[in-house]
UniProtKB/Swiss-Prot annotation:
Lineage of producing organism: Bacteria, Bacillati, Bacillota, Bacilli, Lactobacillales
Organism: Lactiplantibacillus plantarum (strain ATCC BAA-793 / NCIMB 8826 / WCFS1) (Lactobacillus plantarum)
Name listed for the protein in its UniProt record: Transcriptional regulator CtsR
Entry keyword annotation includes Membrane: no
Superkingdom in the source lineage: Bacteria
MF terms (GO), sorted A to Z: DNA binding
InterPro entries listed in its UniProt record: CtsR, CtsR_C, CtsR_C_sf, CtsR_N, CtsR_N_sf
Length: 155
């Protein structure tokens, strides 16, 4: 049996709440208390697991009544979200982040399994075959942005 680390457990917990609702509003300290971790652990989970590349929008409000709101979004159906994702990608995207974008498109039923696998092969380090990592990430970004723009205008 494979053990899970606390970040995986917190992520699974938040995703289970999101499965029943369009969004979740949490108080960082309450979730930290629930899992007996420091609040910065909750920040880490949210910053690394609930990114726009993964199909989530996160809004936080600081202060006494502060909260963190996490919303699962369909990357292609919302032009503003798509624009934000393209802006985040910018001129460069790592293989890991690009895989997360493709996974989100697959989970949103924008891509079928075969299409997602073909894209993953096309943006893979071995396929691109470049020794310059910056150039590789730049080329990968251009491919992903091209796909996203095509999906935007597909009927």
């Amino acid at each position: 049996m494979q053990s899970q680390n606390i970040s995986d457990i917190i992520e699974k917990y938040l995703k289970s709440i999101l499965a029943d609702s369009e969004h979740v509003e949490i108080r960082r300290s309450e979730i930290a208390d629930l899992f007996n971790v420091v609040p910065s652990q909750i920040n880490y989970v949210i910053k690394t697991r609930f990114t726009i590349q993964n199909g989530y929008l996160v809004e936080s409000k600081r202060g006494g009544g502060g909260y963190i709101r996490i919303e699962k979004v369909n990357l292609v159906d919302d032009a503003d979200v798509l624009d934000a994702l393209i802006q985040v990608i910018g001129d460069s995207i790592t293989q890991r982040d690009a895989y997360a974008v493709v996974q989100s498109l697959y989970e949103d039923d924008v891509l079928n399994r075969r299409e997602a696998q073909l894209i993953l092969v096309a943006i893979d380090h071995e396929t691109l075959g470049l020794t310059d990592r910056d150039l590789e990430n730049s080329l990968r970004a251009r491919i992903i942005i091209g796909i996203l723009n095509h999906l935007r205008y597909e009927s």
